Amino acid sequence: MAKTELSKLEWLAKAQAYCARAEHCAADVRRKLYEWGLQDAEIADFIEENLYSDNFLDDSRFCAAYVHDKVEYQSWGRLKIQAGLRALQLPESEISQALKNIDEIAYFGNLRKLIRSRSADSEDKRLRFLSQRGYTFDEIRKCSDR
């Protein structure tokens, strides 16, 4: 059977399996459905509604996982994390709530580690690097003073 001939329920089962493997947002699921060959926006809407109602998709859970992973594994700052979540078209309320729950100790520990690793660079170069990582000037100054 060709991919375009899959029924709504077969598309839904495929999307559920995708969501069961890792935390995803609605934009990720839609992108994946279109990669798989789904062309019908009505079926994509049906799948998205079902994934939300069956708790396969949850914006607050996704935002929390995204924020945790970006802080823990990639040492991103708040601004870069916020931009990444906005790019995924998540609700602003969920984004701000997830950003409020950042582990401050780990967050500023990462920033201090990045500052130490770039200590040989000029001050301007280090500031530019940390800004690209999403840290604010105030956060950088706060950790540089210590």
Task: Name these PLM-found stretches.
Residues 1-146:
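An alpha-helical, amphipathic repeat domain used for nucleic-acid recognition
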